[in-house]
Amino acid sequence: MNHEQPDIESQQSAADAAATAGVNDEVERLRAEIEQVKADALRERADLENQRKRVARDIEQARKFANEKLLGDLLPVFDSLDAGLKAAGDDPHPLREGLELTYKQLLKVAADNGLVLLDPIGQPFNPEHHQAISQVPTPGAAPGSVVTVFQKGYLLNERLLRPALVVVAAD
């Protein structure tokens, strides 16, 4: 009977070792699963944050350019007021002064909403902001510089709304 005792103990030890190994394997599997869940949660949090930033940026862009159509529709009005002031000359007349004040107020309101006037006389030609309609030899002007502006251009929050129509000094 003594001989059977060590067999039972060795079987019990083997069973305990197998059970311990099984538990250790299960613990490792659960740890790996926890790490995977943590990584997935972190990825989801990052995706959510990126989406929040994207939506905020889209809202900001929509706010920035909400006035684009209105201000674009006002450009011919600016042109007409400017032409009227040039036609009136420099004579001090109440109608001319009223027209000039109206034009300045309108330009200020537009500027407060992100509109920037492009009046590039003397500046180098910039194809991103200017549309050349001709080149003329101009003594005293740097080649490639704007010498005449036929129609002023405008930027809205640094984005071109209308290019300036210009004449450029020939090389």
From Swiss-Prot:
This is Protein GrpE. PANTHER family: GRPE PROTEIN, GRPE PROTEIN HOMOLOG, MITOCHONDRIAL. Belongs to the GrpE family. GO terms for cellular component: cytosol. Participates actively in the response to hyperosmotic and heat shock by preventing the aggregation of stress-denatured proteins, in association with DnaK and GrpE. It is the nucleotide exchange factor for DnaK and may function as a thermosensor. Unfolded proteins bind initially to DnaJ; upon interaction with the DnaJ-bound protein, DnaK hydrolyzes its bound ATP, resulting in the formation of a stable complex. GrpE releases ADP from DnaK; ATP binding to DnaK triggers the release of the substrate protein, thus completing the reaction cycle. Residues 1-22 are annotated as: Disordered. GO terms for biological process: protein folding. The gene is grpE. PROSITE patterns: GRPE (PS01071). InterPro entries: GrpE (IPR000740), GrpE_coiled_coil (IPR013805), GrpE_head (IPR009012). It comes from Stenotrophomonas maltophilia (strain K279a). Keywords: Chaperone, Cytoplasm, Stress response. It is found in: Cytoplasm.
